[in-house]
Each structure stands twice: as structure tokens, then as C-alpha cells.
Amino acid sequence: LFGVGLKLLVRRPLTAQIIGIPTWFVATEWLRSSFPFGGFPWGRIAWGQASGPISWLIRLGGPALVTLAVVLIGLLLALSIRKHRAPAYSLAGVVAVIAAYALLIPATPADRTVDVVAVQGNVPRLGLDFNAQRRAVLDNHVRRTEKLESDPDIVIWPENSSDVNPFTDPAARQQIERVQRSIDAPILVGTVSPEHNTMVVWDSEGPGESHVKRFLQPFGEYMPFRDFLRRFSEHVDRAGNFQPGDDNGVVHMNGVPVGVATCYEVSFDGAFRMAVQGGAQILTSPTNNATFGFTDMTYQQLAMSRMRAKEYDRAVVVAATSGVSAIVKPDGSVEQRTAIFTSDALEAELPLSDTMTLSARVGPWVEWILAILGLLSVAFTYRRGKKAFHD
């Protein structure tokens, strides 16, 4: 789809190309990230800039603005080479990025901190069939938590850390209650029911506030067109039947408002945005990465968490069943991280923030405006070309 619009836009004058091509790319990326089945934003260009100099633009306009900058700079460089022009356009792009960086408000020093532990219990073995060993996964997280030598304020377990539902399994409930009493701190526990993928706060009074995963993975956590697709394969029923939640992702642990985006949710703009707008002062992305194996997907997901930390000026705690777990500072740097497929725990004293970055304030408007501008550029070019053909 991008190529169709690009073919039209390259015929336009230089200024029209500079405006139209990057914004059209944003439009097609928005479409892919939104449709079908909620979209697939995992492959957005912005995620590749976690260590790049233009990553700070995410604080102004979210991932869409970073994407725009990447495409714009690449386009200006290409034009300066192809057209044999002086690199004025490239220089203008660099100046624009520097100017945007100067607009950023420095991070406010934290008045309050919280002592957080992320527990990575590990899984018995690789692959999808680890879910058949649910009890062992819970046991691993209980044992690793019992080994903690510190007194944390809050403890984060990963998604699916208790795939044995503690609301229906007395033994699982007793395990969680026992380890919670031993550390005397609330634990964010990942568990499931037939309908929901849930992160629930477990403290001395038992289960409390929870976040039900809102952005679900199609063909895994639920199966679109299940009845129709069953005609072709009985394996469609291996997919879950989860229903999306409707909360804003904020849970309170020891009085701290924590924003939760479970696994796949971290790639969606709305997940952490709703949490920050709902008062979250620290963010966490509990995730089950066991099925990623040794692929790069777990590191791609970590890059997303780093960008979200920059976007909202908040620390992000990544707790994974099998890694990579990480402590990400508000500037996006990784303070600590684990190896994959090991049992480990990370502890850090992290700042609490109530800063509202521009991205948090304006929400999706920057992306919508850029996408509309790109769509109008292509539509105008198409209409103009059609009119010229008839003339």
C-alpha cells in the first residue's frame, strides 16, 4: 500500500515529496497497527530507535513522530544524493530534530521512590508445551521469590506466572499467600481464567485490584472466525477464548499507582497512555516470553519498553517468565537485565513520577493529523494526475 502512494508522490515537486512521503508512511503504519483484528504495531519503525538520537521525539508525539523523523531524514539523504543537490535538505532535517530536542522539558527530579523487585522464575523447558507444566512455572516463581534477601515495597511477577488459577485451585492460592506473607510485600501475579488474562495484586488481605489484558493477540489468545476456520482445521481450538478487559491498567501496590501493560500490550499506544492519564507513577510490562525461545522477539519487546519509558518519563519494570527481564530508567536506559532462560530477580529503587509529557497529553492526535496529511497528499496527487490525463 505504501508503494502505491509512493509511486504517485515521487512525481510531485520536491517540497510535496518531502511533506507527502513521510506522512503517507505514517498513514500506512497507522493502518497496519490498527487493522485488522486490532492491528499489529510490533513492527513500527520507532521501536528500532531505542538507542538512537531521535528517540526523544516520542515524548512530543509518540511513536508516530519518531517514524516521521526516521523516514524524513532517510528521504532527505536520498534526495540529496539522487538529485545531486547540496545537502541543504538533509541539514534542515538535522536542525529540525535538534530544535525539537531543545523543546523537551528536562525530567523532574523524583521526590519519591519505590523499591521494586522483578522476579523471573524461568520455565521447565522451551516451546509451547511448557504450558502443560503450569504447576512447575508457579513453583519456580515461588521459590525464587522466597530467596529474596531484601525487603521490597512491591514485587512484580510475569504474565502467566501462575497459570494454575489461584481462584479455583486451593493449592496454588496457598502457595501465593505463603510467599506473600514471607516477604510482607504485595505481589503482582499473572494468572488466567477461561475468559481473561489477568494481572492481580496479591497482598496480606488476599487478591485485590487487577488489570485484565485489553489488547489481545489474535489467533493465540482468541480466534477470529473460529466456527468458520474450524471447517479447515481442528487446531483452531488450541487458541484461547479470552475476552478483553476495559480497565485503564492502573493498580495500587503499597499505595503506589502502577501502570500495567501485559506483554503484547506494550506495543499499543493506548495501553500505557491510559495508565499514565489514570495516574500511574511507575510502569510495568509483565510478559510471558517463553514461546519466543532464543529469537530476537524478546529483545524487540524490551526496545518497546525502553521507548515507552522515554515517552512517559517513567521507569518501566519488565518481568518475564524466562527473560529478558529488565529495569528501565525513565530516560530509556537499561539499569539491569537478566539472561534468558535463567532463574533470577532484579531489585531497584525507582523514581515515582507524575509528569505529563506532551505525548501523554495529546494522545493519538499527532498520529491522526500526520496520517490525514499523508492521505490527503496521495489523494490530491491521484486526483491531479487523473485530471491531467483527461486534459
Ranges and model annotations:
Residues 10, 82, 146-149, 181, ...:
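Residue-level signal for alpha-helix termini/capping positions
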Residues 103-219, 238-241, 250-255, 260, ...:
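Soluble catalytic regions of membrane-associated enzymes that act on cell-envelope
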Residues 223-236, 353-364:
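Short, surface-exposed secondary-structure junctions/capping segments
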